Amino acid sequence: MSTDTLMFTATEHGQSMHAKVKEFIETQIEPIEAQFWADCHAQNPDGDWTKWHWPEKYESLRKQAREAGLWNLFLPDDKLGAGLSVTDYAPIAELTGRSLLAPYVFNCNAPDSGNMELLWRYGSDEQQDKWLTPILEGKTRSVFCMTEPDVASSDATNMQATAVVDGDEIIINGSKWWSSGLGDPAVDVLIVMAYTPDENKDRHHQHSMVLVPAKTAGVKIERMLKVFGDYDAPHGHGEVSFNNVRVPVNNFIGGPGMGFEIAQGRLGPGRIHHCMRCIGAAEKSLELAVKRGMQRTAFGKPLLQLGGNFERIADARIKIDQARLLTLYAAQKMDAQGTKAALTEISAIKVVAPTVLQEVVDMAIQIHGGMGVCQDTMLPAFFAQARALRLADGPDEVHKTMIAKLELKRHGFSRSSSKPVKS
């Protein structure tokens, strides 16, 4: 990302933090990243997630980052985070997206960043002390359980998992999958979204978020799921079942029926972070493509001078810059007017950024040839990230439908009527 872009998006404080993060990534993370992931694969057998662990010799990196004040930067709180706005943090998220390791080092990787912000905004004092503080300190990890295996999760009201009040307890039953981070040995708590029936409330106030300690009786990790053949150890994406799981009634976050409202509050900034990380990954992919294409020759010329590759590089540059500017606009609007006012822009970037990343990575893979699909570059991981993100957190089709509905409303129409709606 150029400093010119920073000039019209970030405050002086944001620019300063951006410079520090950039230097840390370039000097401390990038030189050891390839070895880190090689060690992860060597030390974490795919077939047995119960033995997964993070290579201990790299923990000093996290300690260095924390001591340098590069810790929990996504959190806008001055004491718990760095006091950065969404707009300030967005370019930093882009930097972390260039690396597969950086989000872990800075304690800002998903789903923890979203879960921490959720607990910071909506958690009670007791919940924050018990669950938020250890995650903020990097001592524990968390999981967000929303998607279910037996229903179309593009309609969140389809949820079959239930969270029913029984006296001073909540009883949870059901299954969730694609619960990211479930294989991490440091996971201590799951945030579970489930159906809480209440005939006195509308359909969008009958779902709740519940804090479930990972070792509660009745919680069972069924399996880890491969993404394009990779388990993503030691993080993992798993399927988990809840069989008559009982937790205290004060484990509701924000109270029963608040699930959808909290989800929107969690997912708004989170989508900015996801999309800027996508843009960072796209930048890295383009950089790799240019270097590979100019250093390799065929028929007496650099690869980039053959077969329309100049145009492919130009298209990538244009798409990345367009995606970045749209995402920064969404961030600025969210800061200035709130998440609700930026719903169109937030849905738009959720469609655009992963798609741009997928297209740029595909181009970079083609330039690299066989090397592009093996473990010698980040490209396969970036491709998996892009393709999965077009489904995670709402598929493209859901976001496009949202954009269209908001556009009709802006012009005075409803989805079902061809006549303007009277205001």
Predicted regions and their residues:
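A short core secondary-structure module
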Residues: D168-E169, N173-E222
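Flexible, small-/acidic-enriched active-site or ligand-binding loops
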Residues: N158, K215-R246
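Short Gly/Pro-enriched turn/cap motifs at secondary-structure boundaries
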Residues: D150-S154, G181-P185, N200-K201, F228-G236
